[in-house]
Curated annotation (Swiss-Prot):
Keywords: Calcium, Cytoplasm, Cytoskeleton, Lipid-binding, Membrane, Metal-binding, Methylation, Phosphoprotein. This is Membrane-associated phosphatidylinositol transfer protein 2. It is a peripheral membrane protein. Residues 639-653 have a biased composition (Basic and acidic residues). Residues 32-51, 262-341, 606-657, 861-880, 1282-1313 are annotated as: Disordered. Gene3D superfamilies: 3.30.530.20, HAD superfamily/HAD-like (3.40.50.1000). It is found in: Endomembrane system; Cytoplasm, Cytoskeleton. Catalyzes the transfer of phosphatidylinositol and phosphatidylcholine between membranes (in vitro). Binds calcium ions. One of its GO terms (cellular component) is cytoplasm.
Amino acid sequence: MIIKEYRIPLPMTVDEYRIAQLYMIQKKSRNETHGQGSGVEILENRPYTDGPGGSGQYTHKVYHVGMHIPGWFRSILPKAALRVVEESWNAYPYTRTRFTCPFVEKFSIDIETFYKTDTGENNNVFNLSPVEKSQLITDIIDIVKDPVPPSEYKTEEDPKLFQSVKTCRGPLSENWIQEYKKRLLPIMCAYKLCKVEFRYWGMQSKIERFIHDTGLRRVMVRAHRQAWCWQDEWYGLTMEKIRELEREVQLMLSRKMAQFSEEGPSELSKDSATKDQASGTTSDPGSKNGEPLGRGLKKQWSTSSKSSRSSKRGASPSRHSISEWRMQSIARDSDEGSEEEFFDAHENLYCTEEKQAKDMTKWNSNDLMDKMESPEPEESQDEIYQQSGSEFRVASSVEQLNIIEDEVSQPLAAPPSKIHVLLLVLHGGTILDTGAGDPSSKQGDTNTITNVFDTVMRVHYPSALGHLAIRLVPCPPICADAFALVSNLSPYGHDEGCLSSSQDHIPLAALPLLATSSPQYQEAVATVIQRANLAYGDFIKSQEGVTFNGQVCLIGDCVGGILAFDALCYSGQPVSESQSSSRRGSVVSMQDADLLSPGTLANAAHCSGGSGGGGSGGSSLESSRHLSRSNIDIPRSNGTEDSRRQLPRKRSDSSTYELDTIQQHQAFLSSLHASVLRNEPSSRRSSSSTMLDGAGALGKFDFEIADLFLFGCPLGLVLALRKTVIPSLDVFQLRPACQQVYNLFHPADPSASRLEPLLERRFHSLPPFSIPRYQRYPLGDGCSTLLADVLQTHNTVFQEHAAPSSPGTAPAGRGFRRASEISIASQVSGMAESYTASSIAQKGPSSLNHTPSIRRLSLLALPPPSPTTQGPRARARQVSPNLERAPCLPDLDIGEVAAKWWGQKRIDYALYCPDALTAFPTVALPHLFHASYWESTDVVSFLLRQVMRHDSSSILELDGKEVSVFTPSQPRERWQRKRTHVKLRNVAANHRINDAVANEDGPQVVTGRFMYGPLDMVTLTGEKVDVHIMTQPPSGEWLHLDTLVTNSSGRVSYTIPETHRLGVGVYPIKMVVRGDHTFADSYITVLPRGTEFVVFSIDGSFAASVSIMGSDPKVRAGAVDVVRHWQDLGYLIIYVTGRPDMQKQRVVAWLAQHNFPHGVVSFCDGLVHDPLRHKANFLKLLISELHLRAHAAYGSTKDVAVYNSISLSPMHIYIVGRPTKKLQQQCQFITDGYAAHLAQLKYNHRARPARNTATRMALRKGSFGLPGQSDFLRSRNHLLRTISAQPSGPSHRHDRTQTQMDSEQRGQRSMSVAASCWGRAMAGRLEPGAATGPK
């Protein structure tokens, strides 16, 4: 539901407005009623008492809107649904209006209006609660300034030009509001609270936005301009005269509508009468309403669509009943299981009602009005989804650029960008778009998916908030001409009244094929590349992107996906030739074809040029000639000619072909895949090749693309045509310049097609990967999308179809894309997946020269091969131990599939859609499915899992083992207590588990507390918590130990049973709340007796500043190096603090931010009076009960007494701060900083290695992860730009030690650092696959 408050100031009194409004309504009803499909019927108009607002006038109308609804939408609605029922209660200065629609139960428009004598500055006219006010979007309408579509503009209705004859008012200036206030002239404001709801699958956001912007705002702007400019007609009228006019109009409309439908009015009147009889007292609703102004208006005041349907039950099936069933089916689907909290879609997506309205209604409807440039015919059938064919204009100004330039004049001082992932939405619309519709529809879809991203991240991916940016790249409507052409070929095209039959007959699959065969397709791809570079450049110049060094991903919809693919194919060509070479971008290996007949072009047996997908684009013009020998003057290009020179336009005969256009088109199509065909063994070089370098002007992307996401794209059909036209071309050779392609589609979408069978035919036997429902698995279901896992899981399929032929190899002509280690990681969701998948394609070092499809960036992630000669099976076992468990495929088949693949994961992904959609008219499905992608939480959560990592343990060990993927053992369930759902509506999780230390022969106990809110405002009481532990970290399996129930204080305590007793080591622990999948992370450290440890007081020894106003303190220079030194010596690191455990997430995030080594962290149990006593008791517990030994301690002067209490030698107590005589003999003061102290420890032999060898083996070297920071994967080119901007020289390192800088550089050079395997993740929403990132 979208809720907006419109404020409309007018230069008149409230009483005058009442007359003007009533007169305007009756006049417009009279003038705009044309009959069937467009008109108004007034069924009832009577006074009422004691109703909404007290006493007033009740009106019951029916609007026939069939001619104003898009054709595809009209085809799925029952005939009765083409009427909108209006019920209004007018009690000035308050009115209420409700619109409903028969047979469309989940649709309603509710408008509440107050009329005040002000200029619209009252911010709480409707007495909304704070929660309701936070949901509200305010939109001020100015009848003078707000633009009007050219098709609706009339000079006599322009307030800037109109002057009344009767009142002498007007014209109005643009500052009329200020002028009227200053001169104390009459002025009033209409406050309209509008709530629009259309709860149907796939259409909700788009339809609700369309109703607000076109059905409400646009209508209100025009109507209020008319109310002012028609004042000479209504000024001086009385209410009696208005009522008389209304009766005349009611009689006239009933007669006019009866001419077109003898059944419609009477039938609806019958339904209305039935409603009145059934409801009894509904004609006087205010009698039961305690609110005098009618704020409690409910649905029983509206015409009951259920009673309307009841009169038709039992009748034989008809188109009417089928259409009714269609809408009911998708409505039921949207509310499936709504009685259960967990399965309620709205409650699941939005934690609170406040978030629901706030997040989904951020789009400003002024964008629509500002972009209306061209007249729109009223008879336009697809107004909602039509796209504008006008040029895209960049919304930037000189002033903004000047500000940006001033801010980035010193790039070295610029803070790092918070944006880690940039999503460019290539929006081209559907294949049925005519290209002449609403220009803001593209931006509206982009805003919709942006809001869904924000909502999903806020609920389940909080660490990603603020780190993802989305920008629109509008694409030309390339299918518009093809759609217009094919529409004229329909056998029903002559019958305008048979819209459904004529459009259903359109062969949808032919539209993208025709579009990509058009000579204008080259310009479309060039335009997309240019606009994408422009959008990226504007983002880089903006404040949030000036230091951007993250990854860029493309999202292509039905049409935009085709353009994105071809743009990536061209961008991926190696630039080996010079810019001026005539061979650059051309295909030099071709075959001449035999001559056929005059005027006919013959395809070569192995013609070149990756066709854009059309019949005319399939052949190269150089591969064919006209029979006419007079065509000898077709120019030939050679190595010395300028590739940019245009062909002479001379003809020696009347050829029917525009050779210039066709040759440029052919050159473009060929250049798309020139690197593939250049090395075709079947092709021979021809010095007489004449391919223009027409694609040279296309340009390339100015940035590296990580992933390409396709939404319902018919790319498979286009590539299948290219394969048909060029039989020698293997589709897998058309490799786009990105690391992974994701083809998302709904199985019932007629526009979509699969890609995997084109790359490997045996995949036709496998279903596409099913994306889990967000409502049930908000963080994924843990199923692997890796190609390696698919090949092993379905090994029988590939073995049965295995052919004895040698594995295919990708052409060597395509150069490698050099990538950084960060780019390696971004290939797949998680580091471990890149290891597994890339290892499959590895055939040995020698194969690199022959199989460029096996990317070097994949091999860089692998450990160097053993110098000893090993068979392929042995190598496979080394790099992927998991493959040993399943029967292995022959390496021949594995290598063949991996060499063909566009990435290292599955490519085809199927989304859920209601089964009832298969019964919908075909013409309606492209629009419906296209709208569903932008508001789909399934799509958004899947995208998030691909582009980001959540768990710090997603980094690999030095030995190259895979990090285990965590998957929730149980799906979400309903809360055990009904009150829990209400208590947690507006609070975030703040769960924590105490770091546990145990002996291998003693009790191993883990305790946790589950709270919500930053100050533990809400306790999770009586709810289920699942306990998981990783048995053999980091590559072991997550084991579900037990399910606990929290007590009244939100605590749980679990003792690991003897059957699962842990040996010496550090084990990650997760406790997951069953009701909402929030979780807490911690570790249990099992140690042998006699283990030595070094203790650090966090605030006393690390903090260099005091935390004021909630800001994080600075870290003392060199502190991290000292802690790491003791860790390298084999000591257990203990961190103690007097802070309450409710701050655990914040403190651990601070430790992770500064790369402190991993250790056990001890917090106070809530707010305590004596935190020093807590520190002492914790250390005494370690020594007395666990038999550990303290070797050294660091802290402030306050900590001296704590360390003395555990009998620690003064020589091993190190205090940071000014020396005092009182403590001179009790400790060692660090006066020259940690750098000097570290030098003393190293070179004066004051620190010896730990004595317990078993402990040193168990305590692996590692650091805290980065909780609270979504560690997005970075692309190579942005890293290079960032590195080049880093300050150089030792003078810039005064705040950071040498070791810190080196560690970060090592982290950039190799992501296989053991440290983060033991990273600690901030308690947040659980991400299945957290260990290696998303699946």
